[in-house]
């Protein structure tokens, strides 16, 4: 898959650099007001009862702050954050080692929790429900099961695909929170905060322009800010102006709606080659030289969100809003 500046997935380098941009406390976390309010209540109640916070499932599109929220929960509850991911836990023994190393009040963050295999998942059930771990000692007829007590802890699971979680696992989360795309005003605040961390001067109008082109996603907003800052710095400009932001974003092929050249290729292909559809997913994939699964999981969600395409039983259709964006009239017949 081609690397895109508007991808919501983090690169390895970004995962490291994002650490300095992440707020440490819930009060400093911008956006997601309903989730924030509810978490604040649940955490305060748990502290009053001197209990571990109920297990939390954070779900929603990538790049919206699930990892950041997990770190904030650990900080607010006074525990250490232990981080891993679904694909990294290959065997039940791997998970057992992680669980037995936890201290009381720790937060175990499992990213991409939907990718846990079923054998590992079953080890989690008693750990989440009763804070205990069942392990089998020996083999064959002499094998016996031993139950180990675990300290009270909070599991925070993150997923972009909540529907792929098994019912038994999903039902063991006491708190479920969906993270939504951000409003431009919220993203502008995030961009301004990041600019301060970068020691860059950013005009408010430039911050809002970056926000509008960031697909409602903080990770994309921060990535665009870094690149626009590069253009301003090389251009010898003391501050990032609206004019500089627009010019740099055009150079990066990110249009006012946050669409890039791949979006253009997909949408224009539907309009010009198939008269707006309906056209099958496999046909679109062959036309733009991409895998059907990638189109469905990576490219389409934002295009659906802004109302540029529709999914129908007969295939994908380009909407009137899509035609209007490109200044094209739909051909009859």
Curated annotation (Swiss-Prot):
Mg(2+) binds at residue 67. Keywords: ATP-binding, Cytoplasm, DNA damage, DNA recombination, DNA repair, DNA-binding, Hydrolase, Nucleotide-binding. ATP binds at residues 21-22, 63, 66-68, 129-131, 172, 182, 219. GO terms for molecular function: ATP binding; ATP hydrolysis activity; four-way junction DNA binding; four-way junction helicase activity. It is found in: Cytoplasm. It comes from the Bacteria. Residues 256-333 are annotated as: Head domain (RuvB-H). DNA binds at residues 311, 316. The RuvA-RuvB-RuvC complex processes Holliday junction (HJ) DNA during genetic recombination and DNA repair, while the RuvA-RuvB complex plays an important role in the rescue of blocked DNA replication forks via replication fork reversal (RFR). RuvA specifically binds to HJ cruciform DNA, conferring on it an open structure. The RuvB hexamer acts as an ATP-dependent pump, pulling dsDNA into and through the RuvAB complex. RuvB forms 2 homohexamers on either side of HJ DNA bound by 1 or 2 RuvA tetramers; 4 subunits per hexamer contact DNA at a time. This is Holliday junction branch migration complex subunit RuvB. The lineage of its organism: Bacteria, Bacillati, Bacillota, Bacilli, Bacillales.
């Amino acid at each position: 898959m081609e690397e895109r500046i508007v991808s919501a997935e983090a690169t390895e380098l970004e995962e490291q650099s994002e650490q300095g941009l992440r707020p440490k406390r819930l009060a400093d976390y911008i956006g997601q007001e309903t989730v924030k309010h509810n978490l604040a209540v649940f955490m305060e109640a748990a502290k009053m009862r001197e209990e571990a916070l109920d297990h939390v499932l954070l779900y929603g599109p990538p790049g919206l702050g699930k990892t950041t929220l997990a770190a904030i929960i650990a900080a607010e509850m006074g525990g250490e954050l232990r981080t891993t991911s679904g694909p990294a836990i290959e065997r039940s023994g791997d998970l057992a080692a992680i669980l037995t190393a936890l201290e009381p009040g720790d937060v175990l963050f499992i990213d991409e929790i939907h990718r846990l295999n079923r054998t590992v998942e079953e080890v989690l059930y008693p750990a989440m429900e009763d804070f205990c771990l069942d392990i089998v000692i020996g083999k064959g007829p002499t094998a016996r099961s031993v139950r180990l007590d675990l300290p009270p802890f909070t599991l925070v699971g993150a997923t972009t695909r909540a529907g792929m979680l098994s019912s038994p696992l999903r039902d063991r989360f006491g708190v479920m929170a969906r993270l939504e795309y951000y409003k431009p005003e919220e993203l502008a605040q995030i961009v301004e905060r990041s600019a301060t961390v970068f020691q860059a001067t950013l005009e408010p109008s430039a911050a809002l322009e970056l926000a509008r082109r960031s697909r409602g996603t903080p990770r994309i907003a921060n990535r665009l800010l870094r690149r626009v800052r590069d253009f301003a710095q090389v251009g010898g400009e003391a501050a990032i102006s609206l004019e500089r932001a627009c010019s740099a974003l055009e150079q990066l092929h990110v249009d006012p709606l946050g669409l890039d050249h791949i979006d253009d290729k997909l949408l224009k292909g539907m309009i010009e080659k198939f008269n707006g559809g309906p056209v099958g997913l496999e046909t679109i994939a062959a036309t733009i030289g991409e895998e059907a699964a990638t189109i469905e999981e990576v490219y389409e969600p934002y295009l659906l969100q802004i109302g540029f395409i529709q999914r129908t039983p007969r295939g994908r259709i380009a909407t009137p809003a899509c035609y209007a964006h490109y200044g094209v009239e739909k051909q009859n017949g």
